[in-house]
Amino acid sequence: MGLSRFNQDATCFVTSSEGNSVTIYNCDPFGKCFEMVDEDTQNIGDDDARGDDNSGGDDDLLVEMLFSTNLVAIVHRKQGILKSKKLKIVNIKRKTIICELSFPHPIQDVVMNRKRVCVLLNSDQIHIYDISCMKHLHTIDIWDSQVKSITGQGVDSLSNSGTSNMTSLRERSSTFSKSISPKICLSNDDRSILAFNCYSTSSKSVILNDVVIFDALNISPLNYINSVHKGNVASLAISPDGKFIATASEKGTLVRIFNTGAETESELLTPLLYEFRRGNRPCNINQLTFNSDSTLLGCVGDSDTIHIFKLDSTSRLLSMSVNSEDNSHITSEDIKALRKDPNSKQFTKLISKTIKKSIPSQALRRDFAHITIKNTKTKHILGFPKEFMNQVYVLSNDGSFFIYSLPSTSGSCVLSKQNDFK
């Protein structure tokens, strides 16, 4: 059984079979809502089936829900190279295709809310659409020097390097494993804050450890956070209101939470808010997710423990005071100039300054709550229901759905209910 995901407020979840069935379940009370057999997976021609599958992911189908509506986005990831380039918006209740979009490269991921649909291709491009009419609004090329210019990162070095060097960097990135390919996430609210990680380049290496914050509603850049980890960013999440992003390192031992700067300009001055240690042993982080009011962060990996971190004032990092004689930090005037004219030379001045990093005044904190996984060979995803703030949902690709109660104090979550959907 393929494992897809919860909807934006964890009231429902969607699963896909290894064949062509897409099913939506209600979480509480538990029950099947809709089921659709997608005829597009049948009678696949030989020409369509040939070719490498570079779309990434473990599931045959990529399915993204739009809250509790009948609309879902569907991508066939392993039904041939042609189908992996095609996105369908489907009314699963009526079993009709609303629209169908074709792209030049396989689709890596799809995220959407009530205003925007964002599509990530494995060619490192992001396409932004107006969901009301599916009009194409903007394309972001993660490798494009324009993205670097918008965010103020290395404009001159990229421009002077020439096309051949850019092509070389793209080819070098294609050797990466699928687990460290670019990630995208979109806030649930109508402000539609988009976050994605991008490449930090040098003459010897290409690392996916920078994060861009983009206003997908107004099609404008908001922030650029460089070197959020020493290595690649393995997982990325944004809070429902778009105020915070969470990142996990490729090693899987550290989880960090930053201000996106979407709320106020002053937030950009000290972007790092929280830093947690997941564990000492390496782990592949598959999912990070915030609860509805951004007070909890769930972390799911391939270890035997699901971690839940508490985001409160006691866990927040304290910044060291900046030396008054040191003018190398970013000021609010810099940020105002950045947003007023994103093509000005202010970017060079801005990026040349040393960002004063937040330094923790205490040892890194551990999780507030945890869930022990009995079968580590199965894949799990986590959901925080908005309706029931003291509960946590866990979905397993062996066909099990668990409801846990959060502890009042630090400790283990208590299993309160289990359902099967095989």
Curated annotation (Swiss-Prot):
<dbReference type="InterPro" id="IPR048720">
    <property type="entry name" value="PROPPIN"/>
</dbReference>
<dbReference type="GO" id="GO:0032266">
    <property type="term" value="F:phosphatidylinositol-3-phosphate binding"/>
</dbReference>
<keyword id="KW-0926">Vacuole</keyword>
<keyword id="KW-0963">Cytoplasm</keyword>
<comment type="similarity">
    <text>Belongs to the WD repeat PROPPIN family.</text>
</comment>
<dbReference type="GO" id="GO:0005768">
    <property type="term" value="C:endosome"/>
</dbReference>
<dbReference type="GO" id="GO:0000329">
    <property type="term" value="C:fungal-type vacuole membrane"/>
</dbReference>
<dbReference type="GO" id="GO:0000422">
    <property type="term" value="P:autophagy of mitochondrion"/>
</dbReference>
<feature type="repeat" description="WD 6">
    <location>
        <begin position="374"/>
        <end position="414"/>
    </location>
</feature>
<dbReference type="GO" id="GO:0016050">
    <property type="term" value="P:vesicle organization"/>
</dbReference>
<dbReference type="GO" id="GO:0000407">
    <property type="term" value="C:phagophore assembly site"/>
</dbReference>
<dbReference type="GO" id="GO:0032258">
    <property type="term" value="P:cytoplasm to vacuole targeting by the Cvt pathway"/>
</dbReference>
<keyword id="KW-0653">Protein transport</keyword>
<dbReference type="GO" id="GO:0070273">
    <property type="term" value="F:phosphatidylinositol-4-phosphate binding"/>
</dbReference>
<feature type="repeat" description="WD 2">
    <location>
        <begin position="102"/>
        <end position="153"/>
    </location>
</feature>
<dbReference type="Pfam" id="PF21032">
    <property type="entry name" value="PROPPIN"/>
</dbReference>
<feature type="repeat" description="WD 5">
    <location>
        <begin position="280"/>
        <end position="319"/>
    </location>
</feature>
<keyword id="KW-0813">Transport</keyword>
<keyword id="KW-0677">Repeat</keyword>
<feature type="repeat" description="WD 4">
    <location>
        <begin position="228"/>
        <end position="268"/>
    </location>
</feature>
<keyword id="KW-0072">Autophagy</keyword>
<protein>
    <recommendedName>
        <fullName>Autophagy-related protein 21</fullName>
    </recommendedName>
</protein>
<dbReference type="InterPro" id="IPR015943">
    <property type="entry name" value="WD40/YVTN_repeat-like_dom_sf"/>
</dbReference>
<keyword id="KW-0472">Membrane</keyword>
<feature type="repeat" description="WD 1">
    <location>
        <begin position="1"/>
        <end position="35"/>
    </location>
</feature>
<comment type="function">
    <text>Required for cytoplasm to vacuole transport (Cvt) vesicles formation and mitophagy. Involved in binding of phosphatidylethanolamine to ATG8 and in recruitment of ATG8 and ATG5 to the pre-autophagosomal structure. Protects ATG8 from ARG4-mediated cleavage.</text>
</comment>
<dbReference type="GO" id="GO:0034727">
    <property type="term" value="P:piecemeal microautophagy of the nucleus"/>
</dbReference>
<dbReference type="InterPro" id="IPR036322">
    <property type="entry name" value="WD40_repeat_dom_sf"/>
</dbReference>
<keyword id="KW-0853">WD repeat</keyword>
<feature type="repeat" description="WD 3">
    <location>
        <begin position="166"/>
        <end position="206"/>
    </location>
</feature>
<feature type="short sequence motif" description="L/FRRG motif">
    <location>
        <begin position="276"/>
        <end position="280"/>
    </location>
</feature>
<dbReference type="GO" id="GO:0034497">
    <property type="term" value="P:protein localization to phagophore assembly site"/>
</dbReference>
<dbReference type="InterPro" id="IPR001680">
    <property type="entry name" value="WD40_rpt"/>
</dbReference>
<dbReference type="GO" id="GO:0080025">
    <property type="term" value="F:phosphatidylinositol-3,5-bisphosphate binding"/>
</dbReference>
<dbReference type="GO" id="GO:0005829">
    <property type="term" value="C:cytosol"/>
</dbReference>
